[in-house]
Amino acid sequence: MPVTLSTLKALRQKGEKIAVLTCYDASFARVFDAAGVDVLLVGDSLGMVIQGHASTLPVKLAEMAYHTRCVAAGTTRAFIVADLPFGSYQPSPERAYTAAARLMAAGAHMIKLEGGAVMVDTVAFLAARGIPVCAHLGLLPQSVNQLGGYRVQGREDGDAAQLVADARALEAAGAGLIVLEMVPAALAKTVTAALSMPTIGIGAGADCAGQVLVSYDMLGLYPRAPKFSKNFLAGAGSVDAAVRAYVAAVKDGSFPAAEHAF
């Protein structure tokens, strides 16, 4: 049966973890789909891992649509979320709708955008017009220059309270999922408890409703991996076995371990 947003919400209610991986093409989509990954995130991380840029900022909407079509072509079961790239949604809700509609037409089941309270009106605008929205708080890669680098967010009391408030506001506006990136595990646990929608963590501890990794990090393609990642290909023997090990580790709660959290 195809995974839907209702499926993901039901998994959260049952306490079953949601396994998410980034995906950029049809071949990996087929492997990930068959291995039981619940959600495929067509991430603007492709700017770094596919295109070789130093950040996600150069990625264009046309490129996101292209990779979304590729992933959709290889997927029969998993739920597909596609990132709105930098500059495609920030100017206005109307601009966001035009960009989101393009990704939905390419095969996405939901779009993802970054930002807190400033994005509430945009989330409400999209949700009211039938476009499912995944929010994204904590480290915001599209704001890396403003944030001063890839640093853990929410460590200060005021920042933590604001993140919780933003998460609640985004859910009230109509967001159906939310990614929490590089925030302290205790804060992610608090946010998860405050929301009805599933939280998907990356570097956010084990108490989120699900976990996401950049697939290339999970497969150990780089000599240096983020603290929150793990090489599941080491000793697995094949990409398929590695992905199945990742899904199993997320589902049974053994990943992420304390060593992967902040």
UniProtKB/Swiss-Prot annotation:
Protein name stated in the entry: 3-methyl-2-oxobutanoate hydroxymethyltransferase
Subunit structure and binding partners: Homodecamer; pentamer of dimers.
Pathway: Cofactor biosynthesis; (R)-pantothenate biosynthesis; (R)-pantoate from 3-methyl-2-oxobutanoate: step 1/2
Binding-site residues for 3-methyl-2-oxobutanoate, renumbered to this chain: D44, S45, D83, K112
Pfam families: Pantoate_transf (PF02548)
Function: Catalyzes the reversible reaction in which hydroxymethyl group from 5,10-methylenetetrahydrofolate is transferred onto alpha-ketoisovalerate to form ketopantoate.
Cofactor(s) named in the record: Mg(2+)
HAMAP family: PanB (MF_00156)
Annotated catalytic residues: E181 (proton acceptor)
UniProt keyword Magnesium present: yes
Keyword Chloroplast tagged: no
Any one Gene Ontology cellular component term annotated for this protein: cytoplasm
Cell location: Cytoplasm
Example of a GO biological process term: pantothenate biosynthetic process
Binding sites annotated in the UniProt record for Mg(2+): D44, D83, E114
Gene name of the encoded protein: panB
Single annotated GO MF: 3-methyl-2-oxobutanoate hydroxymethyltransferase activity
Catalyzed chemical reaction(s): 3-methyl-2-oxobutanoate + (6R)-5,10-methylene-5,6,7,8-tetrahydrofolate + H2O = 2-dehydropantoate + (6S)-5,6,7,8-tetrahydrofolate
Keyword terms, alphabetized: Cytoplasm, Magnesium, Metal-binding, Pantothenate biosynthesis, Transferase
PANTHER family: 3-METHYL-2-OXOBUTANOATE HYDROXYMETHYLTRANSFERASE
Cofactor detail note: Binds 1 Mg(2+) ion per subunit.
Cross-referenced CDD domains: KPHMT-like
